[in-house]
């Protein structure tokens, strides 16, 4: 389909407009990324489900790509909690069922780029579990947006799966940073940990800080 095709333009507009309508009035959202290929019995899927459940119990909405694997685990955890929204932003793919049934709100996107934007537009943090090219694409776009000040202040990026991610983090620290491709502050954007209690504590503190600042702003106004 050509980019000047009116159908193409309409579908792009639909993606953004429907995404905004679905998410703009929701607060306390975090996004979870990870492979669609991960089995639900895998340790990382189990961890993702537990973390999503615990965060949802605190009233924190969980956003995922709405697919299988880690995405399903994240939605499943939030859905089981029944204390927050379990949001799935999936993509139309040929010959493949790309959605999971554990969502309270969902949207099917036409294009990857609009879906990727909406996955984090209304989020305050992202938690990245092991994944392939798609997960890496999502993670590095978020890091780039955070690095360049396009995300909300204090946006957090967590990598869960120390053994899986450690060589990537080493590359960032030992190759990108020493050659001047990134700054020291850019390294600090990433938290590598398997401690989900730490993530829960950090995110809760961040969202509580947001709430306090919003209340102060209301008083000043």
Language model features by range: what are they?
Residues 35-38, 92-94, 131-135:
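Short glycine-rich anion-binding loops that position phosphate/pyrophosphate groups of nucleotides
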